């Protein structure tokens, strides 16, 4: 866990991807900041916690965002929405990963593990939490993770 936290906080490296090209892996703070400052492209910022709290409302928000940028005019009938909600639910994706795999998973653990919010508060040691909060205080407050 310490290695993952250090990578999230301090690493800014190029890694060879499975496509055999180098990919820049920036810190979490840099990643967030780059999207925040990228004003030339419309973007929609959604937190995982918000999706958990009101999935259907967030789905409608996503559809409205896509419709505002395209000529697709995605219909929002109940059957269509329920199909999206069912096939993108955490439990469904977790089942798919167990049955057929998932490219983003590591060899040692599943990608879709628990699907709960704020798990970092119970999983990380106090030292790890303090380190993250000290390094990421401003963005964590902006996102509502700290008060």
At which residue positions do the language-model features occur?
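PAPS-dependent sulfotransferase catalytic domain
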Residues: 1-111, 126, 130, 137-138
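Short His/Asp/Glu-rich catalytic/ion-coordination signatures at enzyme active sites or charged loops
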Residues: 110, 114-124
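Generic N-terminal initiation segments characterized by hydrophobic and/or small/turn-forming residues
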Residues: 121, 133, 137-140
């Amino acid at each position: 866990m310490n290695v993952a936290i250090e990578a999230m906080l301090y690493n800014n490296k190029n890694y060879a991807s499975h496509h055999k090209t180098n990919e820049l892996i920036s810190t979490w703070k840099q990643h967030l900041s780059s999207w925040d400052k990228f004003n030339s492209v419309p973007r929609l910022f959604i937190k995982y916690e918000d999706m958990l709290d009101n999935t259907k409302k967030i789905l409608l928000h996503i559809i409205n965002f896509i419709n505002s940028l395209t000529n697709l005019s995605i219909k929002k009938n109940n059957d269509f929405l329920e199909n999206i909600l069912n096939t993108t639910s955490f439990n469904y994706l977790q089942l798919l990963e167990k049955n057929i795999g998932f490219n983003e998973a590591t060899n040692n653990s599943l990608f879709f593990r628990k699907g709960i919010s704020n798990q970092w508060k119970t999983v990380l040691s106090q030292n790890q939490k303090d380190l993250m909060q000290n390094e990421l205080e401003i963005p964590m407050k902006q996102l509502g993770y700290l008060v």
